[in-house]
Amino acid sequence: IPESVFSLPKYAINIHPSKLPRWRGAAPIQRSIMAGDKDTAIWIIKMTKALDQGDIILQHDLAITSSMNASQLHDVAAEIGSDLTLQAIDLIEKGQDKAIPQTEEGVTYASKIQKSESKIDFNKTGSEILNLIRGLADYPGAYMEFKGKRLKIFKAEFTEQEHHQNIGAVILDKNSFVINCRNGVIKPLIIQLEGKQKMSVEDFLKGQN
């Protein structure tokens, strides 16, 4: 956006869902979940030509629960962000806005999500895999290979346990299945086989029998 656009009003503002300068960029919600962050924030900042580097007008801290996926965090952030925006506009109109410069310590960047990131690596820990599933639940969906097709996993559970089977091995029973990972097993709950609708694992397995 050209600097000339920013100079038309008193200044332009931006809603950003992260604790800046952590996760500057296009995908802060997904990146924060994928990284296993326990909390984030909704910030109202001044827009500048530099990426997400504007001064802070308002902020609201927000916990990221272990069950929250990117879509759910987005919805919570949008609701809080709309309220903060109205508050910020009111402060600006009254001349009471006191913007604080961002620190440049701890800068990280939230690059756009690439489809190449979405394949699950079961050599990773259960927590890392669940974070990937939660972070990509909205788009594009974390996936594994199942009988030669992509199987997206949108919700899963992890149980930490020792096992002596191959990493990535799928263990099926009547109503569920688990996949061995580095330090336990991943149990998918909501899935979507390539070319099919999203469904529970129980319904999926009924169709396989």
Where is each model-derived feature located?
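Donor/substrate-binding cores of folate-linked one-carbon enzymes
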Residues: 1-109, 116
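Short, surface-exposed, charge-dense and proline/glycine-enriched linear segments
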Residues: 2-12, 32, 47, 73-78, ...
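Alpha-helix N-cap/helix-start motif
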Residues: 22-26, 122, 197
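Sequence-level motif detector for i,i+2 pairs with an aromatic at +2
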Residues: 39, 53-54, 115-117, 148, ...
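Short, charged low-complexity intrinsically disordered segments located at boundaries
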Residues: 61-64, 107-123, 156-165
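Active-site-lining helix/loop region of Rossmann-like oxidoreductase modules
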Residues: 90-145
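An anion-binding loop in the catalytic cleft
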Residues: 123-209
